[in-house]
Amino acid sequence: MEFLLEQISQITHGVVLNRIKPKILSEGAEYPILTISQLIDEENGVWDYEVPTALVDKKKVKNLNLAKEHSIVIGLTSFHRAAVLEKQHEGKIIPSNFVSIEFQNGIMDPYYFAWYFNEHPEIKRQRMIAIQGNSSV
């Protein structure tokens, strides 16, 4: 049986940080931000990195896309990989350079999905086509 990813999961684009800033500092709450460098550091066994924060308008907090344990993020810029978020990332803001995926009712193992997305030759080929012409300077 075949399913589209959107049929078995919630796919959410990360938030643009400038859109959640408070107009008045006293109306803001500080939240940690998930970054690509954190995920790369963790892949390389580095765990003592700094976690940047953002000031968020308190009225916008309830609509934030916050990281949850075992959800998946896919980097849309230089990372271009899927990563399963662990406990230490819970509550971090997922910024606009990521898409997050949460599977419904455990229908798919997030680690299997991340492995498949990152390692399957056909998916790699499709990713290369999608990012062709995009580069970081």
Regions found by a protein language model. Give the residues of each.
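Short proline/glycine-enriched turn/loop segments at secondary-structure junctions
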Residues: 23, 88-89, 135-137
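Short coil/turn segments at secondary-structure boundaries
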Residues: 18-26, 48-49, 128-130
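Specificity-determining recognition surfaces
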Residues: 119-137
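Non-catalytic DNA-recognition/assembly elements of restriction-modification systems
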Residues: 1-22
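A short beta-sheet element
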Residues: 56-64, 69-120
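Proline-centric
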Residues: 1-7, 99-110, 124, 136-137
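Short, basic/aromatic beta-hairpin or loop at an interaction surface
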Residues: 38-53
